[in-house]
Amino acid sequence: MPVITLPDGSQRHYDHPVSPMDVALDIGPGLAKATIAGRVNGELVDACDLIENDATLAIITAKDEEGLEIIRHSCAHLLGHAIKQLWPHTKMAIGPVVDNGFYYDVDLDRTLTQEDVEALEKRMHELAEKNYDVIKKKVSWHDARETFVKRGETYKVAILDENIAHDDKPGLYHHEEYVDMCRGPHVPNMRFCHHFKLMKTAGAYWRGDSNNKMLQRIYGTAWADKKALNAYLQRLEEAAKRDHRKIGKQLDLYHMQEEAPGMVFWHNDGWTIFRELEVFVRSKLKEYQYQEVKGPFMMDRVLWEKTGHWDNYKDAMFTTSSENREYCIKPMNCPGHVQIFNQGLKSYRDLPLRMAEFGSCHRNEPSGALHGLMRVRGFTQDDAHIFCTEEQIRDEVNACIRMVYDMYSPFGFEKIVVKLSTRPDKRIGSDEMWDRAEADLAVALEENNIPFEYQLGEGAFYGPKIEFTLYDCLDRAWQCGTVQLDFSLPSRLSASYVGEDNERKVPVMIHRAILGSMERFIGILTEEFAGFFPTWLAPVQVVVMNITDSQSGYVNELTQKLQNAGIRVKADLRNEKIGFKIREHTLRRVPYMLVCGDKEVEAGKVAVRTRRGKDLGSLDVNDVIEKLQQEIRSRSLQQLEE
């Protein structure tokens, strides 16, 4: 009979099989009321599942991350329950958990309107407020199939036929008259599922295959309590205000159009930001001793077959042909960099060789996945590859890590999560090689006093990697930086150097990206700063404006002086009221507005206002220029008044 060991090390002895709910009741009624599921020997199980042998047990409640995920999964079933009541002929497909919520794909003979979604959410609340018990039944494959055949659930039948072994016992979850199939676990009672909201609908092909029927996907969010739900909805509201697509249009940074899906048309101001980022990155490339190169836009398919990309990545590659040869438009820069490395004999004395490129890449992303600058088909990578010996890995990774933090610093990201992905089951190379490589990455992180977590088995087959994830002001995660060891590609493309022993050796290749896609990073910055770019990045840094025509000459003279000082400046000599001009340039998020009236002309000064509405008073022109130059040169996040 089972001995149950709890997280605090205490044990409870039973003379019969028990469920997590039984143990929770044994501990106390308060815990039992809060119990959503259990973790038995590390595996999540339903609160009603019986434990027959000795086991470790942790009770899962809504306070646990797993508990919240279970609530969301059960809300997907609740959605199914409600939609079958409103539209009984609906066929249910799949309803998984996603970040912050859930969705369900349904086959419905009507296109859901906003009114339909509101009615569906209302019915979900009515059902949840009944606080009914969710009943789990393990049945044979044949019984499960018969259940769904009788209910006309063709997609569930297809899942059983194609994905579940005949000797398996699927779990059926009964929500009153509604039945769904799932691995589980799920909440024991719907009292846990009161705090949710349906968010939107979209189209989705069955099994993600465009040859299959288009279904309707209903998205929802769910939380453990009302406070968390409201906080999330407020974050969404703030995110909508910061949406880079909206701000990009307001500030005339770029546009996209149907004739070039996923490709960016950069306007002057947006391209100014892009070029300033390039200048910044180039300054760091020089500091960290990189060569800058430029590879071709496309290369023969034969090369991509050698690298393995054709076998594993061809669906994401654009191709073209000429004179009976097929070419691939590059989705990444690494094969081209190996070709540059291969030109001329290399010695160990030439290593490490650090090669960087602002590489123009293209990937055939699904049209439904495209999203402004965040998910595009054409993008520029701040990509680099380091060719080195095994003995140089640690020092090179160390330098990469320093460079990553050095480059993130001017943008003010306060939270950076670092993960080290280790060897997968399927991999190349010896265990000794992986031992050393993983140790080199870990030690490099430790030497830089960077906390990190392991992602066991999540490395690529050709080497371990470090991932850097930025969290923005809304606590959204953006995975940008990567340091990836590669023991495969150099040998596939016959890269070699002559070692100290005069023998040919294959170099180790380190893939290194910091900003990632330049387009995506500009999208991230646009939302992080809500369009209030720091002065060094702002497309227009200063606007000089007159109050009446009599100051026009002084404005032009001052504008020229600012231009000569390397400041991006515009003159506004329009015959408009000064309040109108100030408001317009404030909405354009111009960092500084210099107002010139008769007093300023007479004193050789200028009245300085900021886009945040602060009046800095009348200041000496040369002092203003000097302070602006210092702010821009230092790439400061702070403005003069701050």
UniProtKB/Swiss-Prot annotation:
GO terms for biological process: threonyl-tRNA aminoacylation. Pfam families: HGTP_anticodon, TGS, tRNA-synt_2b, tRNA_SAD. Its main location: cytoplasm. Zn(2+) binds at residues 334, 385, 511. Its cofactor is Zn(2+). Its EC number is 6.1.1.3. Residues 1-61 form the TGS domain. Belongs to the class-II aminoacyl-tRNA synthetase family. Catalyzes the attachment of threonine to tRNA(Thr) in a two-step reaction: L-threonine is first activated by ATP to form Thr-AMP and then transferred to the acceptor end of tRNA(Thr). Also edits incorrectly charged L-seryl-tRNA(Thr). This is Threonine--tRNA ligase.
